[in-house]
């Protein structure tokens, strides 16, 4: 979305000048609807459309940010950068909001190697990725689903 020129995404205004793979100035929560294809939705729309109360949205956003901070800390201890991730929340019959689905797996998250700890926060146009984006990137470049065995092994 950003690469196509949008600067307001998920109700958040992003500054001009971000480069691909550049760390954002702040951690952001980017909610989506759940379906065959996830669609962006703003926090305001979530409340206005009755998906959640403002209080429940604030609770979920707070928990998502805390989980992400925890994930980044744990990843860094292992020489990794937790780039982004997906959290899914649900509600029990008694109304309690809970985290559902997987947490910080390679299927729900993107990880990069910290190649040089001294350059951890510097821009890296070609980070070493440890996730399924390797396969996605190959398919985009070659337009082929004939994925070499060595690439599959790498993933």
PLM regions and their residue ranges:
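Acidic/polar, glycine-anchored loop/turn motif associated with catalytic or activation segments
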Residues: 1-84, 90-155
């Amino acid at each position: 979305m950003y690469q196509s020129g949008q600067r307001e995404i998920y109700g958040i205004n992003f500054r001009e000048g971000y480069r691909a793979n550049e760390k954002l100035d702040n951690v952001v929560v980017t909610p989506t609807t759940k379906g065959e294809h996830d669609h962006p939705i703003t926090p305001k729309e979530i409340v206005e459309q009755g998906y959640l109360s403002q209080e429940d949205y604030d609770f979920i956003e707070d928990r998502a940010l805390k989980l992400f901070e925890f994930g980044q800390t744990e990843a860094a201890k292992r020489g990794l950068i937790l780039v982004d991730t997906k959290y899914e929340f649900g509600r029990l019959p008694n109304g309690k909001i809970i985290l559902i689905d997987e947490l910080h797996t390679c299927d729900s998250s993107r990880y990069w190697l910290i190649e040089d700890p001294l350059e951890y926060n510097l821009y890296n146009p070609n980070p070493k990725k440890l996730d399924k984006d390797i396969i996605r990137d190959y398919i985009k470049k070659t337009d082929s689903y004939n994925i070499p065995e060595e690439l599959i092994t790498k993933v």
